[in-house]
Amino acid sequence: CIGAGATAGSGGIGPAAVLACAQSGGLDREGMVKALVTASAIGIIIGSRATVSGAEGGCQAECGAAAAMGAAAVTEMLGGSPEAAFHAAAMALKNVLGLTCDPVAGLVEIPCIKRNASGAMNALLSADLALAGVKSYIPFDEVVAAMYAIGKAVPQSVRETAKGGLAVTPTGMRLRHGNNKGEEK
């Protein structure tokens, strides 16, 4: 079974959360397949009602969608209800509302790699909260709508153009022009 991630730039989030959960809980292949189906459903909802593109919605759309997908998948894997999976997805997405997409030198490396790590932790935390009975008072579909509205409102410079945010810091500009002394990875 193949479950597509939200985007290449956020592609490590869902798999990291699902694999960490599967390895620590000794879950089987069938459980992982169900989790991927759940993740895919969340991704389809976000993609059809908003966007998963950093160029259109910022990193909140890319990493937020991937974290929401991962959170719902982990909730499914650990026996949570569909309602709990939606709460987990909503919480994961809410945690990154407003996050810009500001790739240094226009490459999907800095800060993307670290955002994948924090996105995986966001997914696991949100699943844990939902499984503990914590609910998102803002329903998932409304969180998705809010993310889309925020994405349209943020400046184009922080929507995958490498013209704002970390991309235009002095170090970001040095990296863009190939003057890197000790690359961060």
How would you label these PLM feature ranges?
Residues G31-T51, N95-P103:
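Acidic-glycine-rich active-site phosphate/pyrophosphate-binding loop
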Residues C1-A17, A61-A66:
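Conserved phosphate/anionic-ligand binding catalytic regions in large, soluble enzymes, centered on
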Residues S40-G43, R49, E56, E62-A67:
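Glycine-rich phosphate/ribose-binding loops and adjacent secondary-structure elements
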Residues E76-K185:
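Functionally critical mobile loop/hinge segments
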Residues G5-A8, E30, G54-E62, I110-K114, ...:
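Alpha-helix capping and helix-loop boundary segments enriched in small/acidic/polar residues
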Residues A22-I42, H87-M91, A167-P170, E184-K185:
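An acidic intrinsically disordered interaction segment
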Residues C1-G3, I46-E56, P103-V108:
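Glycine/charged-rich beta-loop-alpha catalytic/anionic-binding loops adjacent to active sites
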Residues P15-G26, A71-G79:
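Alpha-helical support elements that line or immediately flank enzyme active sites
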